[in-house]
Structure formats: C-alpha cells, structure tokens
C-alpha cells in the first residue's frame, strides 16, 4: 500500500489517487512521507506468525546492521518457552519446535458469505523423549485453526469483520516513588519491581529511616533479612552500602545472623502457621523471583531495569538477579539521602545517571501490547492448560505406547484463541461506518481490558494529556464520556518499537544545522534532548535563522533556547495529531473541545450516494483513503483491458493479467452500503499504486465523507435557533445528501420437539395478496418493495397434535393427508422498516453448510436496501465540532440568494460560532468560496510573500490543502477574497471582509446587513431520524407491573413520568390523567374493556384498579402491614374478583392474558 504514496508533482502539491492534485498552502516541506497507517496492526501480526513480510523485514534490518528486531517469531517464542514438558519423575519429556501455518481453508469472501472464520491450520513439530531408554519419537501435530489477519488489518470471525485494539499497559520494570508522610514532613521513598508475570517486589524507607521489603504484597519485613536470605553476610551488606545510614540503622535492628535463619524468618511471615523446613524456605524464595517458569520480566522489563539502574545484563535474563536487587536498594537509599546522580553503565560506557522518581503516566513507562502480543498471551494461557493435561497423560499412559499425538490435547489452545476473538474486551466488532472509522479503529489505543485499567478506578491523572504524548498519541481524538482519556489514537507518524514503546521521528540537529537524518525516539530517549518545532525558520543551508529558538525540554517545558543546544527538530507540524484530527482544516483556530467532537464526528459520517471530496482539505485525504483499504489499487503497472461494473482486468507490463473483483452494494457492519465504483476506462494506462475503483465515501482515491455546500451564517425566522439547521429543498430533490442503508434479516428452520419447522409458501390463514411476492419456496423475490408487516420468508412450526374427531379421522383415512396442525412463524418486516429486496441467501444443512449449528436445518438471510433522503430531524455536522439537527427544509425559492441569483444550500446560526470558539469553520467557508471560484494574483502583494509559486493563480473548483498548523493564514485568505475570478457579469460577489449582500427569497428584498457566505464541507451523521422515530398502539407489557415496555427495540410506549403528571395536575386535567394512569397503562381489565368498546363502537366505561396499586399493596403486606381495600359502604373488597372479571372479558375477546408473559399483547387477537 505504501506504493500508493504517490509521487509529488512539486514540493507543495500533493497528488492523491488518480489525477487529483491539491494546491497546498503549506509553508513547510515534509521531510518524511506519512508511513503505512496500518503498520501497527500488520507488523505485529507478521511477527507473531513469522510470514514472508516479517522475514523480509528481518533480512533488511540485518543488512543495515540493526539489532532491534527479535529473531524469533511470536509463536516460536511461546513454544520454546513451554518446552520441554517433563513428568514429575523427569523420566520423559515432550518439546515443541518449528510452528508453521498450512494453506488457509477458505478465502475471505467465502468466510463472509458462509459465516466462517478466516483461518489456517497451525502445525508444530513435537518430539517425545524417553530418558530411560533414550528413545525419541517425532510427529507433526495439528494445533487447531489459527485466525489470520486480512491485508486490511482485520480478522474475520464467524463471518463478521473484527478488529483487535492495541492495549496501553504499564511496562514491566523498576519504579521509584516519593510520597509525603502524613505525620512528619519527610518524604517516604519506595521502589517496586514489576514483572511481566510473577510476584511484585517492593522496598520502602519509612519515617524512622528503616528500609523494609514486601514480598508478593504481603507483610513488610527488614531488607537486611532479605539480603541475608539471598546469601549476603552482614559484613558484605555494610561494605556494599557503605555510607548509607538507613541501611546501617536497619542492620542494627536485625538480630538474624545466618542465611538459613533469614530464609526461615521470611517463610514464617509469608506462610504463617506452617512448619518451616529449610528446603521449603529456599524453594519459596526461588519460586518467587528466580524461577523462569514462575517469574518473567520479559525483554522489555530487563531493558527498563538495565536502563534505570545502569546495568548491562543481557536482555535474555528474564528473572531477577541479586545484582538487580542490590542496585535497586542502592538507588532507593541514594534518593533518600538526597543524591542527584550515580555512576552506571549505558551501552557499555560508564556515565552519570540521573536519580529520578518515576511518573507512571509518562510514555516511557507505558507500552503498547499490539495484536501479536495479545494473541501470543492468549496462546500461552492455552498451552499452559494443555501442559497440565500432558503431565497427567504422561503418568497414566503406558510408556511404550506414548506418542506426541496421544499426549497432546489441542482443545484448551483452540478454546483460548476462540475465547479471545469472541469475547475479549479488546476484540471488537469493526466500525465500518466509513473508511476513516475503520482506519481509526485499527489505530486505537486502549488503556482498558484485561491487565489494564477499569473505568471506575482510573483517575484524572491517567486520563490527562501528558507532555510525553507529543508525536505518539493524539491529544485531541478521544471519546467523550466515561472513557475520555482512556482510549486514544496513535499519532500520524508514530510507530511501535520491538519493546512496545511508541517512537516518533525527529530530524537530527548538529550545532544548529538541521540535517535530513531522521531518528525515531521513545519518550524516555527524548527526555535527554531539547526539541525544536517543525515551523522554526531555517535558512537555505538548513541553519536556524534565529539565535534563540523556541523549543521544548524535559517535562514539556517550552522556552527560548540557544540554537546550538537544540538536539532534534520535529519532522512535520501534524506530527502530534492522529489521522482523524489531521483531516480538520484550520485545526489551529479551533478550541480543543470542539476539535475533539469534530474528529469523532467524522467517523460517524454516512457514505453518500455520490461521494465528493472536500474543496478545502488538509492533504491527508489520499493517505487515509488508500491505507484504510477500501479503495481498489493497481498492484502492477499496465493497460486496462476490460471494465465492467463488478470487475476490472489489467494487462500488466510484465505480461501477467490481473482481475480486480469489486464489491457491489454489500452491507457493512453498521448497515451502510459498501460499494465500489470503477474510475478507469478500457484502454487506460495505469501505474502501480493508482486507483482502479473508489470505495464507499472516497472520490478518486481521496476520502470524501460529505458534500461541499453553500452556507450562509444568518438567523432565519428563528428556525435555526440553538444549532438548528435550515436546508434547501434542492438538496432533497437532487439526492445530494441521500444515502443507502442495508438491513439484514435472518430466519432459521429448526428441529422442534413436535417436529421440523418448514420454510414454505403454504401458510395457514394468510391471504394470497400477502404471498404475491414469495417464490415457490416461500422466499421473497429480489427486487420486491416491502413495507412493515410484509412476509419475507414463509415458515410454519408444528403445533401440539390435538385429539381428532371421528370425521377428521375419516377424512385423513380417505385422503391420506394430515390436516397439518401448524402455526405461521414467518419472518416479517419489522415496524418502521421498508425498502427493496437486494439479496437472498439460503443455507441448507443437507448441502454441507456445517456452520449452521445443531438443530438448524435451513437458514435464509434477506437483505433490504433503502434510500434515505435527507429529512428534518437528521443530524448534520461540519469538521469543527459544529453539529446540529435539521429543523426545516425550505423550498429553493424561499432560500436567501446571492446577487447573481444563486440560492444558498444551508443556513447556519452565527451565534453557534463565538461561544464555541471553533473559528476554523469561518475560515473554511472563505477559503471554500475562493477555491470554488478560482483566483489570480497580479504582481507580488505583501500578503502573498509566503505563498508558493503554484498558488498565485487557480481555476474554478480547484481542490486546495491547508495542512494543520501550517495552513493558509488569515491575511492570505483576505487577500485572495479580493482577487477571486469575477462572475459572467464581471462582479466579484464577496470581498476581503468575506461577507456579501443576500436577498430574501420570499420578497426579493435585500437583508439589512451583509452576511458571511462560502462553501463548507458538511457531513450527514449516522443519527438518522428514520431510525429513531417510533409509535405504538398496542404492544408488549412488563410481566410484573403490567405497564407497557419502553424503547423502540421492545416496541414500547412513551413514559409519562412524574413531572408530566405534575403538569396535568397543575392544569386540573383529572380525566386525562386518570386515563393515562389506568387504561392506557396497567389497568388490565380496563384496557381490555376499552379495546372491546372501541371495536364494537360503544362508550368507554369507567377505569378500574391499576396493577401497580395491587403490586404496592402486596409490597406493604410483605412488610407485615395488613392493608385492606374498602368499598364506599365500608366492605372489604377482594382484588382477586376484579382479576377474574378481567380474564373472563379477555376470554370473550379471544385474548390470552393468563400467562402474563412479557408479550401478553393485544396483537394476539
């Protein structure tokens, strides 16, 4: 895909997709192109399975002499870790080597079509060795199906596309903290050694200057006892920690002399009440920190400990050493003594290392667990379960007959992988609303999930923006609501290193000269340098122009620094933001809260009938669309030899022929239409990486989420009060904002206790009109228009056989036919849905569709498409967090119009801008107007001094790019407004103020004040009124209270809450209130009688007693209060009598309310 990172026409003009170039207002030339935006997912998975792409990267790294890539793949690491599995007597062992994947079973399309998982069988070579005889048996063992990642970074599990989100977790390593003591004014210092798996080790210096240790979060004990247990004598401890008073004080209080005593003392405190054996005591400590099976620092933990403590232990040392523990205690007591640095090793050289307490929210201490590692951890869990089974079988099976195959049970491994993909918090149903939604989902970083934080426990500090996020995680794009700050998005240029830390690129600066060398730095490495921003002015040779340059230092502090002190410089102004945020033009003029909404709302944009890329873009549109993978791209250069709506064939230059198959009107996960549209013609010459066909919401290989509409900022009769939006009828008529939505409905024919369900056209008591569109199988035909209640698939379910009368028995005997006792359980179009049938799939168990599940004989899936025009109540938004609901659609003749007669498309309220501080939208409409009309600058005006040569003139409808933090300036926009190309009449409708005279469409009179008019990019969001509007006549009732259910999904009613009751009480509307609280709600007898009266055309009777009153009485009786209901003459009334009457009345009407199920609905008449 990186091949599609099209060449640039010149430094400033970005060429995206096919023949689309954007005229850029950028002042800075990017030294680095945007990297592959899916690398976070694909590279991690490549490492896990060790495929060809991974092998190529390892070879390239070796050729460059780099050692940063691990040699072993993820699966190799895990099988190596578990090998060998030995029995208790160590007489035999089983080991695994060389895991490999065979050819995949089904293609991606087959998996989606038939609801299967896109996977390949995993095999491993298993070797069984009998130590007694020296016999070795080797077999290749099948370890289950292993899900594969598609090229687009997704997984297909049971036919649905899913994404595994990367997790942000605390890195293993050693951490030092200081906390103020509540009673004294001393700082209490503590240290924690946190492994990847295993027990924590904690040290603490208390207010009495005693050094304590906590093993596995248990009771605190003296650190000198712990050191003695590790084999040090008192003399060695004093020599090692000479000059540290706190250790001397601790040693004075310590009466234990020998290693054995120390071990026993620790054992007593960890396992109180147990008998202490010297061997058990030694084994306990060994198992905690020195046994690789129980304790693992992982490479990253070892790297962090080496770096923090100035050690040089090899990265393969995954357990603690005595040296680590001594170094940790030394660091801690040095901090306590107020020292600022100590001498340690870095890269084999002795250097001074700063003594610091750690900030847990710093990105040097938080790392990413990407897909590969998450799956690896899950396989590890499965293998450790399998290990137990293998050990059991080793002891029970006959040693002569054992082979690797008989020992291994792959079920735990398969179950662990299935569990992860099916139910883990980090394996998510992919957001396919539009290409950007999918791309952002794959680049998401989550602090939640197993081993991470929980929403409830996460404080403000974890959620806050940290200086170390710069260039690594976007400070803007995060959800609103309870997850704010816990879920983020990877910054545009960031990448993950082999330890899982996020790196960001910088240009190296040597003595004030900015070189083209690009180094990727982690947050910890960056702390050692002073970094200048990307727009620091440089001269022609690359030196800083100013003597003192604005730069940031450790901790994010910004200051003016002498040029020669600068170590690095940003590669691009958009380095700090994510892809979603970098698509917002004039981001620098928007308040951060609104920019957050803008970035999030772009992901909710619905793909429209005809996509249109923004006139005012940022230059990121092409990168986003191509890397999202929804655009079909030519793999090789060649000539297009054949084109149809669903396939394009290219004759490549090397003689091969490639056919690209396109997806037509598929349903996305979110129910939007996924459709490819060919952009090449037969006979065209096409280069590798160019666009063959556009996907949803893309135009010519550029992201196209909305439409460029003519917007006026003005009030209009109060109809655009409070962010409401007024639209022109033209947008409805021309289908400008229409979108296609596809719903999927399925029905299963199962085996029931009373017989098989059957899909058929022969339905009991159904009129022929309703069957008109069903074929002979009872399935609706493609192309049929359906409305709510129409039958999609005819299905009958057997009823219980009743005793037959003599006549029926005679008829059966004569005609030899069962007068079938079946009920109609057909699939019908739900309430509020309608559309056209565009597809039907039939799966039959007899045809070997084994994925149907037990007891299912047939499954029919029906797809209904509907075209939704824009309508009042739909939600629209711009890219700056400016959102609103359509309140009125005006006839085009009533819309305000420009002096040349052009009516505006949208009227927005100007009061929505100043309070929200998203001024970028105003600059966008001005630049949109300039780009739509074209311009020509004569001479060299002062305001155009920084404009690139190519931007001095442009034809109408030129697409422009204004990159974030480096876009068009206000004075440039004002100047360009004065030099836009005039209309046919020679008029220039808008001047440098950006405002123009508008005329009232109804009267033709000019409005008193000039109005800001221009082109804004407007998105239609997935909050459509058709999905929300809902009405109920009769429907299901709650089982206990007998009140109607709530919500559209349950076909519920509207709640008349206590505030509404107060309103009617205030008006004294007693009868209306009584009706609402009884017969329209939970007066069972009353509502049945009202229904009867309406059916028969009689007067409605008095309401009865509501069910909730009976529930209240039962509640009080359960609290031992004897509550009775008395009639007017003082007689006790049994509420049961009223119930009996209700059942009798219901029976007469043929309504079954005896079961009082959740769906005891009047529909059952």
From Swiss-Prot:
GO terms under cellular component: DNA-directed RNA polymerase complex
- Looking at the keywords, is Transferase present? yes
Give the Gene Ontology MF terms in alphabetical order. Answer: DNA binding; DNA-directed RNA polymerase activity; ribonucleoside binding
The record, for Gene3D superfamilies, names: 2.40.50.100, 2.40.50.150, 3.90.1100.10, DNA-directed RNA polymerase, beta subunit, external 1 domain, DNA-directed RNA polymerase, subunit 2, domain 6, RNA polymerase alpha subunit dimerisation domain, RNA polymerase Rpb2, domain 2
Enzyme Commission code(s) on record: 2.7.7.6
Tell me if Metal-binding is a UniProt keyword of this record: no
According to UniProt, the reaction catalysed is: RNA(n) + a ribonucleoside 5'-triphosphate = RNA(n+1) + diphosphate
Question: Mind telling me which PROSITE patterns this protein's record contains?
Answer: RNA_POL_BETA
Q: Which GO terms describe its biological process?
A: DNA-templated transcription
User: Which keywords are on file for this protein?
Assistant: DNA-directed RNA polymerase, Nucleotidyltransferase, Transcription, Transferase
State the CDD domains in the record: RNA_pol_B_RPB2 (cd00653)
Q: SUPFAM superfamilies annotated for this entry?
A: beta and beta-prime subunits of DNA dependent RNA-polymerase (SSF64484)
Task: Tell me, in a sentence or two, what this protein's role is.
Answer: DNA-dependent RNA polymerase catalyzes the transcription of DNA into RNA using the four ribonucleoside triphosphates as substrates.
PANTHER family assigned: DNA-DIRECTED RNA POLYMERASE I SUBUNIT 2
State the oligomer form and interacting partners. The RNAP catalytic core consists of 2 alpha, 1 beta, 1 beta' and 1 omega subunit. When a sigma factor is associated with the core the holoenzyme is formed, which can initiate transcription.
Membership in a protein family: Belongs to the RNA polymerase beta chain family.
User: What is this protein called in UniProt?
Assistant: DNA-directed RNA polymerase subunit beta
């Amino acid at each position: 895909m990186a091949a599609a990172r099209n060449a640039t026409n010149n430094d400033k003009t970005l060429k995206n997709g096919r023949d689309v170039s954007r005229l850029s207002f950028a002042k800075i030339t990017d030294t680095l192109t945007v990297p592959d935006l899916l690398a976070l997912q694909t590279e991690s998975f490549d490492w896990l399975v060790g495929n060809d792409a991974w092998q190529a990267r390892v070879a390239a790294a070796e050729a460059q002499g780099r050692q940063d890539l691990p040699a072993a793949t993820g699966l190799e690491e895990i099988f190596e870790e578990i090998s060998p599995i030995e029995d208790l007597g160590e007489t035999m062992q089983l080991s695994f080597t060389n895991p490999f994947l065979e050819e995949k079973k089904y293609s991606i399309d087959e998996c989606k079509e038939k609801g299967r998982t896109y996977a390949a069988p995993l095999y491993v070579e298993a070797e069984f060795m009998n130590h007694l005889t020296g016999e070795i048996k080797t077999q290749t063992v099948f370890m289950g199906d292993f899900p594969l990642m598609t090229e687009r970074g997704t997984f297909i599990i049971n036919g649905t596309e899913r994404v595994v989100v990367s997790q942000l977790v605390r890195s293993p390593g050693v951490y030092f903290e200081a906390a103020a003591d509540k009673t004294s004014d001393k700082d209490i210092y503590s240290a924690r050694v946190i492994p990847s798996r295993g027990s924590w080790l904690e040290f603490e210096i208390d207010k009495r200057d005693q050094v304590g240790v906590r093993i596995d979060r248990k009771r605190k004990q003296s650190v000198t006892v712990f050191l003695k247990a590790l084999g040090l004598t008192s003399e060695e401890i004093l020599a090692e920690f000479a000059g540290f008073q706190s250790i001397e004080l601790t040693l004075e209080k310590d009466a234990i002399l020998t290693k054995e005593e120390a071990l026993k003392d620790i054992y007593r405190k960890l396992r109180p009440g147990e008998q202490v054996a010297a061997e058990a005591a030694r084994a306990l400590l060994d198992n905690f920190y020195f046994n690789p099976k129980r304790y693992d620092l992982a490479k990253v933990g070892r790297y962090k400990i080496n770096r923090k403590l100035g050690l040089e232990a090899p990265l393969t040392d995954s357990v603690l050493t005595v040296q680590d523990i001594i170094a940790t205690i030394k660091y801690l007591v040095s901090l306590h003594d107020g020292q600022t640095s100590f001498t340690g090793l870095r890269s084999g050289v002795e250097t001074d290392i700063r003594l610091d307490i750690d900030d847990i929210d710093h990105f040097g201490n938080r790392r990413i667990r990407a897909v590969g590692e998450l799956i690896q951890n899950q396989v590890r869990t499965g293998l450790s379960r399998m290990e137990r089974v293998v050990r059991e079988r080793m002891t029970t099976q006959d040693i002569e007959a054992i082979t690797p195959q008989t020992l291994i049970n792959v079920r735990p491994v398969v179950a662990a992988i299935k569990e992860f993909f099916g139910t883990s918090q980090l394996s998510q149903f992919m957001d396919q609303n539009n290409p950007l939604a999918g791309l952002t989902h794959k680049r998401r970083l989550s602090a939640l999930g197993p081993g991470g934080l929980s929403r409830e426990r996460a404080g403000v500090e974890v959620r806050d923006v940290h200086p170390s996020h710069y260039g690594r995680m976007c400070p803007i794009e995060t959800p609103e609501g309870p997850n704010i700050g816990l879920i983020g998005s990877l910054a545009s240029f960031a990448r993950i290193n082999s330890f899982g830390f996020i790196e960001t690129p910088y240009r190296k600066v040597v003595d004030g000269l900015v070189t083209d060398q690009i180094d990727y730095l982690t947050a910890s490495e960056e702390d050692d340098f002073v970094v200048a921003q990307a727009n620091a002015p440089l001269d022609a040779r690359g030196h800083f122009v100013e003597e003192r340059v604005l730069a940031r230092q450790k901790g994010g502090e910004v200051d003016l620094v002498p040029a020669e002190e600068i170590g690095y410089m940003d590669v691009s102004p958009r380095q700090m933001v994510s892809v979603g945020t970098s698509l917002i033009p004039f981001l620098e003029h928007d308040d951060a809260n609104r920019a957050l909404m803008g970035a999030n709302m772009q992901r909710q944009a619905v793909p429209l009938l005809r996509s249109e890329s923004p006139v005012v873009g940022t230059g990121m549109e092409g990168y986003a669309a191509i890397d999202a993978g929804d655009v079909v791209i030519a793999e090789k250069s060649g000539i297009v030899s054949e084109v149809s709506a669903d396939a394009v064939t290219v004759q490549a230059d090397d003689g091969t022929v490639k056919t690209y198959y396109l997806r037509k009107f598929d349903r996305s996960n979110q129910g939007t239409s996924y459709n490819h549209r060919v952009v090449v013609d037969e006979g065209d010459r096409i280069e590798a990486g160019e666009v063959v066909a556009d996907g949803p919401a893309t135009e010519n290989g550029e992201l196209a989420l909305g439409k460029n509409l003519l917007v006026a900022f003005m009030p209009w009769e109060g109809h655009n009060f409070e962010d409401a939006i007024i639209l022109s009828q033209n947008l409805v008529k021309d289908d400008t904002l229409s979108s296609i939505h596809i719903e999927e409905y399925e029905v299963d024919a199962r085996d029931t206790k009373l017989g098989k369900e059957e899909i058929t056209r022969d339905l009991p008591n159904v009129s022929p009109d309703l069957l008109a569109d069903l074929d002979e199988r009872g399935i609706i035909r493609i192309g049929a228009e359906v409305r709510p209640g129409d039958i999609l698939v005819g299905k009958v379910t057997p009823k219980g056989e009743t005793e037959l009368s003599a006549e029926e028995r005679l008829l059966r005997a004569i005609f030899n036919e069962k007068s079938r006792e079946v009920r109609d359980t057909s699939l019908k179009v739900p309430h509020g849905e309608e559309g056209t049938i565009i597809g039907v799939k039939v799966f039959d168990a007899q045809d070997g569709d084994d994925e149907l599940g037990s007891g299912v004989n047939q499954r029919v899936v029906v797809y209904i498409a509907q075209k939704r025009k824009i309508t009042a109540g739909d939600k629209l938004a711009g890219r700056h967090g400016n959102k609103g609901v359509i309140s009125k659609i005006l006839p085009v003749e009533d819309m305000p119009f420009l002096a040349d007669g052009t009516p505006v498309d949208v009227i927005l309220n100007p009061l929505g801008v100043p309070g929200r501080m998203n001024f970028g939208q105003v600059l966008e409409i001005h630049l949109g107007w300039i780009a739509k009309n074209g311009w020509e600058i004569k001479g060299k005006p002062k305001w155009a001094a920084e404009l690139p040569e190519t931007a001095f003139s442009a034809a109408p409808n030129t697409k422009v790019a204004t990159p974030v933090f480096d876009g068009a300036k206000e004075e440039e926009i004002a100047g360009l407004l004065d030099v836009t190309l005039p209309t046919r009449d020679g008029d220039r409708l808008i001047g440098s103020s950006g405002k123009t005279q508008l005329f009232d469409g109804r009267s033709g009179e000019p409005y008193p004040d000039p109005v800001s008019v221009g082109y804004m990019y407007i998105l239609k969001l997935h909050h459509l009124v058709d999905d929300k509007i809902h009405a109920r006549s009769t429907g299901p009732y709650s089982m206990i209270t007998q009140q109607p259910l709530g919500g559209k999904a349950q076909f519920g009613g509207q709640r008349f809450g206590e505030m509404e009751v107060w309103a009617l009480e205030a008006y004294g509307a007693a009868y209306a209130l009584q009706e609402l609280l009884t017969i329209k709600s939970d007066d069972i007898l009353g509502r049945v009688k009202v229904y009867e009266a309406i059916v028969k055309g009689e007067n409605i009777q008095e309401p009865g007693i509501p069910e909730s009153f009976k529930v209240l009485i039962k509640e009080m009786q359960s609290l031992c209060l004897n509550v009775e209901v008395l009639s007017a003459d003082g007689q006790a009334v049994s509420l049961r009598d009223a119930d009996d009457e209700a059942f009798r009345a219901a029976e007469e009407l043929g309504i079954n309310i005896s079961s009082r199920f959740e769906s005891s609905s009047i529909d059952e008449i």
